Amino acid sequence: MQVAKSDLYINRKEIVMKYTKKTNTWLDEFERNRPLVIAGPCSAETEEQVLKIAHELKNSDVSIYRAGIWKPRTRPGGFEGVGEIGLKWLQKAKAETGLLMAIEVANVTHVKLALEHDIDVLWIGARTTVNPFAVQEIADALRGTKKIILLKNPVNPDLSLWLGGLERLQNAGIEKIGIVHRGFSTYEKTKYRNIPEWQIAIEMQNRFPDLPIIIDPSHITGNRNMIQEVAQEALDLNYDGMMIETHIDPDNAWSDAAQQVTPSALKQILKDLVVRNSDDNTDEYSKSMAKLRANIDALDSTLLDLLGKRMKIAGQIGQVKKDKNVAILQNNRWNEILEKMVKDGDRKGLSEEFVLKLFKAIHQESIEHQEKVFNK
């Protein structure tokens, strides 16, 4: 899947929103020496189920209890949530356990009902983030709220949509904002339900280092056996917390059964996660890192030089094709290159997924260089 360069590399001067330390003060409200944990069922199914899960999570590292009240299903006919009655179950769960409550809101009616039932955390889902009209209506309905508002990444890998959603929330005077990385839809066959596209989330971190970022390994993996792996990757990238779907009987859950874990499994996952230091100020560490980073910088510069030379040759090839009236795209040649590079990459310890992404990007740039020649 090709991602437009404009989606990933928006000029920083175009970003008008400025986040201050106020953005992450809501994290400081939680007394914790480990990442923030949001957990609970994909869907609130029955009052008994909601309360039982909440009580099993009460004495754990979980601070916020999540449950889907309205479910935006891809196709009609599936379970679409219990609706407003579920909010009363969450009120009862909060009263009995002291956990904060979190739900997804997809429209103004959802927001109104959530606020009426004093839900603590509201998140905007991936299918809503893709629609600027919907996000604006929700932002207007939440204007000036003191609730914690989380924005999931859009379904498609479009950085500008994610940024636009943040801008709309910030412009509505909402200060307690965070983002949730839940992966991106793809037609490609991968081990993930939604591919992480870590570089997009990393770019968000680079632009807004004080903005809390939460990983959602349940939706990224779609597989309970991969949740710890992805959660650990996120912690290694300095994420602030995680949202993990948890159910007392995952295999019989009414929605997304394969990606939910039991409360006991969740506790084991959290126990096994390793929280890294964000930095090390010792002289030995600084000297070692300075040397290694200098090597990386030199190699990166060499890479760019080589790519520049490659594109010049691609332009020359384009001229030959133009002179001989030959089409730019030569599928047989392209497939031969991919096959060879995947094999060479494997011998060098590079994954097939990485090699394919790299050379597809290089190929796209080569085509653009040749198109410029054709259009002269």
What is the meaning of each model-derived region?
Residues 4-38:
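N-terminal amphipathic alpha-helix/helix-capping segment at the start of soluble metabolic enzymes
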Residues 24-42, 73-76, 205-215:
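N-terminal small/glycine-rich loop or linker at the start of catalytic domains
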Residues 30, 134-265, 272, 278-284:
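Catalytic alpha/beta core domains of metabolic enzymes, predominantly
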Residues 35-52, 76-78, 100-104, 125-126, ...:
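Active-site mouth loops of central-metabolism enzymes
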Residues 36-41, 63-67, 101-103, 122-124, ...:
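Hydrophobic faces of well-ordered beta-strands that scaffold small-molecule active sites
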Residues 66-85, 248-257, 317-328:
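Glycine-rich, proline-tolerant flexible connector loops at the mouths of alpha/beta enzymes
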Residues 82, 99-107, 111, 120-135, ...:
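Catalytic beta/alpha-barrel core
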